[in-house]
């Protein structure tokens, strides 16, 4: 399973990119707004740090608005993927983008039927939201399993991005459920590196090593 980072913070991306683990980046309007910066400027900077798909979301609600926004975004860099909400207007846009060879990431997916429809419209990626499903007592990991099973049976090439990741367990369970990608917040990526036994082991090694210097 590939790892993306879910952020629009350039310093977070810069730091994690040095680990050599990132295959892509996802952003959304909320993350961009949090940074207080121009969307296109942020996306341009991200493309200079990560060589992989960079999802930039359209905010228009109509087919026409989505097409106009996408024209500007795809000019930034060939790695830009147009992120589109799972709506009827979004599906029309995804179909048109597919005809034009523009990659898309259909976001706000909360059911297997939504994922199937998005894939058949031509989506490159679909993003089921794990954390938000957990919030209402639904089974986000089970959803990824269902989508992966359907895509496998019917030889659908659309890739599944586990999104709305809240903790390490989401990442591991998404991998086991068949997600092709997990897009992970900065804090969760940092937590994935840590384990208390690792810290204890390092302390012991250093204590033993320091004894040899006496």
Swiss-Prot record:
Pfam families: TAL_FSA. The active site is at residue 83. It comes from the Bacteria. Its EC number is 2.2.1.2. InterPro entries: Aldolase_TIM, TAL/FSA, Transaldolase_3B, Transaldolase_3B/F6P_aldolase, Transaldolase_AS, TSA/FSA_arc/bac. CDD domains: Transaldolase_FSA (cd00956). The keyword Ribosomal protein does not apply. GO terms for cellular component: cytoplasm. PROSITE patterns: TRANSALDOLASE_1, TRANSALDOLASE_2. Pathway: Carbohydrate degradation; pentose phosphate pathway; D-glyceraldehyde 3-phosphate and beta-D-fructose 6-phosphate from D-ribose 5-phosphate and D-xylulose 5-phosphate (non-oxidative stage): step 2/3. Transaldolase is important for the balance of metabolites in the pentose-phosphate pathway. HAMAP family: Transaldolase_3b. This is Probable transaldolase. The lineage of its organism: Bacteria, Bacillati, Bacillota, Clostridia, Peptostreptococcales.
